[in-house]
Every structure is written in C-alpha cells, then in structure tokens.
Amino acid sequence: VAAWIGTSGWSYDHWHPELYPPGLPARDRLVRYAQSFTTAELNSSFYRWPAPAAFAGWRRRLPDGFRLSVKAPRGLTHARKLHEPEAWLERIRAGWHELDGRRAVLLVQLAPAQARDDTRLDYFLARVPDWIRVAVEFRHPSWHCEEVFALLAARRAAYCVMSGAGLPCVLRPTADFVYVRMHGPDREHLYAGSYPDADLRWWADRIREWEQAGQDVFIYFNNDGEANAVRNARTLRTLLSE
C-alpha cells in the first residue's frame, strides 16, 4: 500500500525555475522531474499515442520505484467513444508491455458529451488485460450512479475521483487502488489556481483513510499554471509525512 503523488505532465516551460534549472533542455526534464517525484501522469498520449520504443525509453530513463500513469488516446475515447476498441487496445498493450515495472494506471477519460452506456463500457473493460490497471474519468453527469460503480468494481476498474470547476467530487473507490485528478480549486476555470493548505490537509486525511483500507492511491495535480501543480504536490506529500 502506497500513496503516489505527482503532476499531470512534466514538460512545461513555465515550470522554470520552480522545478527545472535555467537552461535545462526539454529532453532532460523527465529525469529531473523524477528526482523530485515518484510518479507522473503522461497526458500527451491523449493527442498522439507513443510508439512502443518511446515507452521503452521511459522505462530505461526512469529510476526504480517510479510509476508512470498514461492517458488513453482520444482516438479511442473521444472519436470512437470506446466502440470496437480492439485495435486501440493492441496498441496500448504494446506500449504498456514496454513500460514494464514503471507502469502505474491507464487513465480512460470519456468525452463530456458521452452519456452513460453501461454495455459499451463493460465491453471495453472486459477486453482490457488483467495486468493493466484502469481508471475511468467520467465527464457526463449520467455516469455518476451506483450501477456504474458496481460495473467498475466487477471489472476491477477505478472510478476517477475529480476535483475541479463544475466537476462532482465523488469519493467512491471501486478497485484496490484509488485514482484522483486535481484539476484546480478555481470555481470558474479548470486547471487554474493553487489549493490552499487547508484543502490539501483534507485530502491528506482522505489518502490516509484509503491507505488504511488497503488501497494504493495515485493522485495527480493538473493545475499546471504558474507551477501550482508542483507546489501543491510537494505540500501534500509533506502533509502526509506529518
């Protein structure tokens, strides 16, 4: 049982000098990031799924004990809306295999306009290999119900807990791990603002409760502006160590 705290993405120019020293080449950012954090969520994979060689490269560059979560491609989640996922799952398997001991969770974020469809979700989850941990982030309100939670639990997939403007914050674990995305405390805009320490202390208490229940926790800050994600992740880690 462990808590993995990191950020959504790592290659941001505006994270100088909070995390990266001046003049650090973009290609060296991940190695520098891994000196400060033990996990990250790869978001660029949503726009273009990487080749297996890219996953192998990350595996070689990342230290033992580091875990990389990866966002599923929009070709699967937004274009096909999980319909006939087999071809995409083959590509995902190939990359996931290369990541080997560095792999954490495959994040499947559904489109905001995609309403509840239990049959399609179940068909997809049934075809994900058992060795790939999956978390599903629902953006349409119709998904947030007991029947969907039960479906996720039956397939050992995690309901993605969300914190952000206009998003319901439902603390409902459905797997042996919990996946949390922190999209920022701003009430009007996603990915904006910095979480106050009081809020982070509340989240630290929730993480302890999940750990006591025997669940691993993966929590990623997505409020990257002004390096807020970096500072918030560090603060949460400090609060957990108290």
Language model segments and positions:
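Residues lining hydrophobic/aromatic ligand-binding pockets adjacent to catalytic sites
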Residues: 1-242
